[in-house]
Amino acid sequence: MAEKTDYKATLNMPRTDFPMRANLPTREPEQLKKWEEMDLYNLVQRATAGRPKFVLHDGPPYANGDIHLGTALNKILKDIIVKHATMAGYDAPYVPGWDMHGLPIELRALKDMNIDRRKIDPLELRAKCYEYAHHWLNVQREQFKRLGVRGDWENPYRTVAPEFEAKEVEVFGAMAAKGYIYRGLKPVYWCPYCETALAEAEIEYNEKTSYSIYVRFPVVDPRGKLPEGSYLVIWTTTPWTIPANLAVAVHPEVEYGVYATEKGNLVVATALAEKFFQAVNLPAAEPVATLKGADLEGITYRHLLYDRVSPVILGDHVTTEDGTGLVHTAPGHGHEDFEVGQKYGLPVLNPVNDQGVFTAEAGPFAGMFIEKANPEIIKALDEAGMLLGQGKIRHQYAHCWRCKNPVIYRATVQWFVKVEGFMDIAKEAMNHVRWIPDWGYNRMYAMIDGLADWCISRQRAWGLPIPILTCSACDEPSFEPKMFEKIAEIFRAEGSDAWWRRPAEDFMPEGGLTCKKCGGRTFHKEKDILDVWFDSGSSHVGVLETRPELTWPADLYLEGSDQHRGWFKSSLLTAVVARDGKPPYKAVLTHGFTVDEQGRKMSKSLGNVVDPADVIKRYGADILRLWVASTDYRHDMALSENILKQVADAYRKIRNTLRYLLGNLYDFNPDTDMVERDDLLEIDRWQMHRLQEVIRKVTEAYREYEYHIVYHTLNNYCAVDLSAVYLDILKDRLYTSAPASRERRSAQTVLYHVADALIRMLTPILTFTAEEAYSHLPKPAGSPPTSQLLMMPQPDPAYLDENLAAEWDRLMELRDAVQVVLERARVDKLIGSSQEAAVNLYASGGEGSWAELLDRHLPDLPSIFIVSDVKLFVGGQSAPSGTYFGEGPGDLSVEVVRAEGEKCERCWNYRKVGAIEQHPTLCERCAGVVLSLNLDNA
């Protein structure tokens, strides 16, 4: 008896070493090692030299602690953009940077040293800070590399580098030369815990419980406008500022009423009277007199705690939204108070020291910390008969961005940038920038419009010193250009530590300095340091203009939406002054913050923090990268365990699609086996048309930075177009055709083009997986060693055929209708697999009938429906009304019956078998293929 033939061995089943299980946490580090061995960054830079430049300037993360989800999101977005730019034909260098000065690092260094900063030599403290910052630079560098981010990691920019510091001095000097740097007494944000001034960008607003008090000041001189026994009523949530009260402000156009009460004749805005009486538990009353705020100007009152007489003044900042419409004014503790006080020549009283403790000027409260003094001040007001009511409120209040404690407004002598002098120049520069999304322009405009002068001095040690020498005789600062040149020269050679090592004379230009005010020749160095936002805000000069591979301005800045008031703003302000009105960037892209699935901010207290290191450990960096691409970054970006699982599921579908494509290309050589367009089967030409549409959509989405569209397009293409339709239809042809037949090579040609295009389009996003797939893809001779050196695919017009696509779209519509009927037959167990079925189609044959289309494609229909046979009945044949029947599109009806014939042992279709004697269990097609393979064992 002849030995039975193993027909399975005659099938072209998929085979590939590209694993089904990704095992990314293990494989990704192996890939990183390979990239390191090939010196990937420099390899790419050499290969792209001479192309047009695309420069994304890295906003420097702070070198303090592990990266968090927001940092990871930011770096991944940048990497997607840079890699796409390379593959789109640009030379796209990426120089990562770090912000390495500043308060958080200094505080941590002091904590580690367990020492009071007043008792340590500044150079010793700075050395510790330098060491601490570089430790975290190295930690973060490895964490960023683990994300798959490609960059010049061995040569990053650092705001502590001598060359950077020298350039920053030059920027400062350029601003000073134009008169935009000055020293002055003004109220600024002050952190009594960190003992330093803060800029607006260093403030965050959090919930705080504060005292809410209503206070009456007895009128001294009513100037004939108020009755005897009148009181001015103010409301405040900062009782500690009452000792510094020097005026009461009213709005000139607001109506005020005089209300006769058991507490005297109380003056409040009529619009707020009802709320006021409720708040202080007084019976509602009608005013005995009304007058405009302008009538109250010049009236005086007595501050009973200090027996001080002060005036009523006018201020447009006064509103009737809350309180009484009369504003307690302390020029030493508020920006608006200070401004209006200057108009009236009020002194600036600031009875609070650097630590937030009252000085002797506060009288009985001297020595008390302001927050602890609040109850004592309230008690004193009550005893003096000034307190009308008290309570507590929850409200948004300014906090220090680093120590998270409440800050105060405090008038001190600080260094400022006179923003008002060039605000209009900055606004004009904004018109030459592309803002992504568009609302970024309005956000930025709001930050610049009416911006208060920028406080740039900090009372700390770890930072770039304010490069100013001041006359020791009259305290007049020097802005001599040659002085700035000398300071920059020394910093370039020695770093800014030289400021603490060298005497002031060393920083003077040749011939010394002469004070322009008093003629003095002796100068001393400024003790304050520069705001870190001045550091990073100067990076466009310190990096873009000093690194030969980069260009000024940058093509793109990309950061979170909080940077409109941070790096975007500080960079714009320094650039328009130092570089003659030009912005430092051509485009600014903004992304949202990371939140949990419910849209809540991530916090340890809520237990909803997602650690990128944990995600990488459990899922791999490519899952994190896919999440970044899948989410519309223009809004806040949600991540949770549930969302991670959804992303991982989408990743598996993409990976399985790649694996299937590669598995069917094991014997395909693109140099010798490619089928020309006109020789492709029609369904394959249709799929090539679909591929061009996908490429076109993805190309446009990449160009517009819309990565969520890239993701959804490719995800749907893999899951629907390929896996659910085309690849399903192809299986019979791929597996059962002769290996080198036109039918199989036609399919493989398409699979190669699809795999090649997918790898290219996925490389910027799934950077590890695309590289892994590329290593398993059959490649033409001369292909680059990494997918990152491939070019992005471009739509090929030769494959775009709208008429063909319209026909096949109709056939796919019919396929959907057939599958509905097949499923009913399967549920009722008429059939098991769809190959046990045959389909009968009934068409009317009239005008607009499907008959012509179906007749032309009749040989293709069994493979399209994945059934054993399809028959078409046109015109007079009446459609059945049996169980397995359904309406198709248009004039079609669909019937499913069991297929006739026997099951072919090789292809499993039901057809006539045994036509070829040597293979009695095979259909004629399969027997012919087997004979051609010379594998007959019969």
Swiss-Prot record:
It is found in: Cytoplasm. Pfam families: Anticodon_1, tRNA-synt_1, zf-FPG_IleRS. One of its GO terms (molecular function) is isoleucine-tRNA ligase activity. One of its GO terms (biological process) is isoleucyl-tRNA aminoacylation. IleRS has two distinct active sites: one for aminoacylation and one for editing. The misactivated valine is translocated from the active site to the editing site, which sterically excludes the correctly activated isoleucine. The single editing site contains two valyl binding pockets, one specific for each substrate (Val-AMP or Val-tRNA(Ile)). PANTHER family: ISOLEUCINE--TRNA LIGASE, MITOCHONDRIAL, SOLEUCYL-TRNA SYNTHETASE. This is Isoleucine--tRNA ligase. It comes from Symbiobacterium thermophilum (strain DSM 24528 / JCM 14929 / IAM 14863 / T). The gene is ileS.
